[in-house]
Amino acid sequence: MTGSSPNILILGIGNLLWADEGFGVRCVELLNERYRFPDGVRLMDGGTQGIYLVQHVQQADCLIVFDAVDYGLAPGTLKVVRDDEVPRFMGAKRMSLHQTGFQDVLALAAFTGAYPRELLLVGVQPAELEDFGGSLREPVRAQLEPALAIALAFLAERGVLATPREGDAEQLAPAQLALGRYEAERPAEELAYRHGDIRFIAQPGREDD
């Protein structure tokens, strides 16, 4: 720890554009909107930054991660994993096809000798990951509040208390990606193709040039 005030990183990872992949980021957004935290606590939308997250992990004495994790459980199941057990649950999923998985981020931080003393993963079993432009499915959305409660209790046990926020918070992500606006402005199914890039998918009755 660095003195009496540890550096705590609360990190949401995942891709907002792929339905339940956005769970981790939505958790951090809600914490940021609702609460203020003491100095030394940082909230971060980690998105799909991959290896670029290493420096932030290295600086943390305590790391809390929210994410959609394939535990092999029923959709919407919330599972908490701590410390040395965390990396093995983060290994199967890459942040994108071309980026580093979070397991690799943790491994690199450990290799450099700058690794959090405490690590908490609050993960939910996703229901849908293939709906491009989609939002959280109900079983996953229902776990937002319980996930926040777990993180707040974890912090409180360490004497770190969040206080209700008065006024608007500085946004962690572009305003158009905020949950309410993202869902309200989503095109109807008949107006948007959600299963890949239609330019590269063979269309019935259309011959190649």
From Swiss-Prot:
Pfam families linked to this entry: HycI
SUPFAM superfamilies cross-referenced by the UniProt entry: HybD-like (SSF53163)
Keyword terms: Aspartyl protease, Hydrolase, Metal-binding, Nickel, Protease
Task of the protein: Not known. Could be involved in the processing of hydrogenase.
Name of this protein: Hydrogenase expression/formation protein HupM
Species annotation: Azotobacter chroococcum mcd 1
PANTHER family the UniProt entry points to: HYDROGENASE 1 MATURATION PROTEASE, HYDROGENASE 2 MATURATION PROTEASE
Presence of keyword Metal-binding: yes
UniProt family annotation: Belongs to the peptidase A31 family.
Entry's Gene Ontology molecular function annotations: aspartic-type endopeptidase activity; enzyme activator activity; metal ion binding
Signal peptide (UniProt feature, chain positions): none
Gene3D superfamilies linked: HybD-like
Record-listed Ni(2+) binding positions: 21, 67, 98
Superkingdom classification of source: Bacteria
GO biological process: protein processing
CDD domains assigned to the protein according to its UniProt record, in alphabetical order: H2MP_MemB-H2up
